Amino acid sequence: MKHVRIVGVPEHFNLPWHLAIEEGAFEERGIVLEWTDIPEGTGRMAQLLADHETDLAIILTEGIVKSISEGNPSMIVQEYVGSPLLWGIHVASQRHFKSVSELKNTKAAISRFGSGSHLMAFVNAQKEGWDTSRLQFEVIDNLEGAVAALAHGTADYFMWEHFTTKPLVDSGVFRRLGDCPTPWPCFVIAANKHFLARNENVLRHVLQCINLYTKEFKSIPSINRTLANRYEQKLEDIDTWLSLTEWSQKQLTEETFKSVQQTLLNLHLVATEKNFTDMVWG
């Protein structure tokens, strides 16, 4: 049996992986897939890839493009979620903010530098017409850290996936002022180059297997109830999320890659332009 290490966020997007593991789908192909949840998100997962502490990661597109641009020895091996991610823009419920425009020149909570919450703060600032050089950040590690930072006033707002934070909005911990969708497919599968060079056939089996699961995922009977129970979400929220989410079984296109890279260049988040073939496997 070939052991493969994989990391991802503990969110509903990744249920297909857990179902495939639980049902022995990878083991049927001679693969033991060792999944680790990373609640800190993309910045932490990029570091794990760079340090050879994981073989694969289910990671935000913009985050891994930035990380590879900065020398991370990894490659994008496939799209995973082809639809955009809906980033909610949240404040503590007791704060005075009423609109996103009021957040100009305030401090954003981010899980870490290079994370989705960090990069999307720039995308949102550009969308709002703010001076991105004046953005301020407070590193909070994870969602629990964001709750504490916003409550104590060490940060003013926090961007995180809309439906993951919905229970905190419903319970009155956060207020959502708006949403900012990513302008590209949100999640990709990335592989450490050391693993990739030695295990191309193993990787192909992993991709074939997960693609079967994601292709059929929405047609699984009562999958909405399974998701709602497993991730402690309201059924109507899961139904809305499922209607907005499309899993992908294809490689990231050069056009999409260039769009992500150009946005990062325009925001001065990467310094140099890289070739598609240097970053995307195929």
Task: Give the residues covered by each predicted segment.
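Secondary-structure end/capping motifs
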Residues: A197-A271
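Hinge/cleft segment of the Venus flytrap/periplasmic-binding protein
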Residues: E273-G282
